[in-house]
């Protein structure tokens, strides 16, 4: 059975992870094991000693596509599509390296989410794609809350990272993908599109897609 693969992109802080989680929740507990979320953050490259100096100086660009091993991500998603048991990496942002894996085995629906989810290396793998749009002020505010909670950064640090890396990389590498997305989602009101996607994939959960 070939899984149905959904790609979800948008600027950092647009609500991609929440959108993916809410879509999976919408599918209900009965089908929870048939719906898998793959966060591309898991494919961040482990930081070597030389790059660690850049990280400590606030000069390492985590928002550039190269920071994520997109080739590895493509191989994993392709293998899942082909029905193989796949070990998906888990990245630790504190240690700046891969710290383990979790197994994905024969899901019916795969939700791939990340800022570079619609990168040309990954785009051909999807059956449908969505792009979340929010005002930049909202994206920055959400990013500041997450960075403070998960990474101990001050709002000032987050604002500087946003100005230096997030926004330029978004304009250069992420925003151009908007025109390729099948669905544009208002990141401030996602309920309509969650319901729409759910109705789209519900038959796939009931009847296998060969």
Curated annotation (Swiss-Prot):
Name assigned to this protein: Uridine kinase P10
Function field: Inhibits the integrated stress response (ISR) in the infected cell by preventing the sequestration of eIF2B by phosphorylated EIF2S1/eIF-2alpha. Stress granule formation in response to EIF2S1/eIF-2alpha phosphorylation is thus inhibited, which allows protein synthesis and viral replication. Phosphorylates uridine to uridine monophosphate.
Family annotation (PANTHER family): URIDINE KINASE
Result when mutating residue 41 to A: Complete loss of uridine kinase activity
Phylogenetic lineage: Viruses, Riboviria, Orthornavirae, Pisuviricota, Pisoniviricetes
A Pfam family the protein falls into: PRK
Subcellular location: Host cytoplasm; Host cytoplasm, Host perinuclear region
Catalytic residues identified in the record: 41
UniProt catalytic activity: uridine + ATP = UMP + ADP + H(+)
